[in-house]
A protein has these predicted regions:
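Cysteine endopeptidase catalytic domains of the caspase/legumain-like
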Residues: 1-220
Length: 220
């Protein structure tokens, strides 16, 4: 049986930007995700609208989350209920927080969110893989490894952030070695960036597959 389709939840709308640090030290989207995941029996059908509302509030309207491909299983929830005790869960926290060619190379909020999100997921019974790849090659390696592992699990979640852009309708995560001074044309993005769809495709669990992308979607 093929894996269920992956639902991708973006921290902002197409063309939008995100905040690296809020009052809690990270992205407002991450803060909202962590807080809402603690609610008992917060099914996805209620969780996703609440995540959107909370992120808008915490970012003072700058970030308006959107969801691509709604989950087919909307009754699933982060808290482990009695019926979900036997559920096998795996998560990848994929963070790009350092950039080689930028004047301000570190995303301090992204680095903080690696720890915050990993802790939250572990608390909900996930086997958590943390990856901070220094370049595109390592990023692809982390995705291949996770794809192979996630096939043996019931639920797979990826949380990813770093600098991001949107180009011709597709959103990209920019690796730490991206050549920013050369711009963002189609060829450069194909050779040096990673589409969010590629990140989402690493989720191959049997029941629920979710990807959260917290980077910007700045138009190029």
């Amino acid at each position: 049986m093929p894996a269920p389709q992956v639902s991708t939840i973006y921290a902002t709308s197409p063309g939008g930007t995100t905040l690296d640090q809020d009052a809690c030290g990270g992205n407002p989207f991450a803060t909202a995700l962590i807080e809402l995941s603690q609610r008992p029996a917060s099914k996805l059908s209620h969780f996703l609208p609440a995540l959107r509302k909370s992120t808008i509030e915490k970012s003072a309207g700058q970030q308006v989350p959107t969801c691509e491909r709604l989950p087919s299983n909307r009754t699933w929830a982060f808290p482990m209920t009695a019926g979900a005790r036997a559920e096998k869960r795996i998560a990848l926290v994929l963070i790009v927080s350092e950039y080689l060619s930028l004047a301000n190379p570190r995303l301090l909020g992204a680095a903080a969110d690696e720890r915050r999100i990993a802790s939250m997921l572990a608390g909900h019974g996930f086997s958590v893989v943390q990856a901070v790849p220094p370049d595109r090659q390592a990023l692809h390696g982390a995705l291949r490894s996770f794809a192979a592992k996630s096939k043996g699990f019931d639920v797979a979640v990826v949380y990813s952030t770093g600098h991001g852009v949107e180009h011709e309708g597709s959103t990209y995560l920019l690796p730490g070695d991206y050549p920013f001074l050369r711009g963002y044309c189609t060829t450069l993005l194909a050779q040096h960036a990673v589409p969010v769809d590629r990140i989402a495709s690493a989720c191959k669990a049997k029941k629920v597959n979710l990807t959260f992308f917290a980077g910007c979607r700045t138009n190029t």
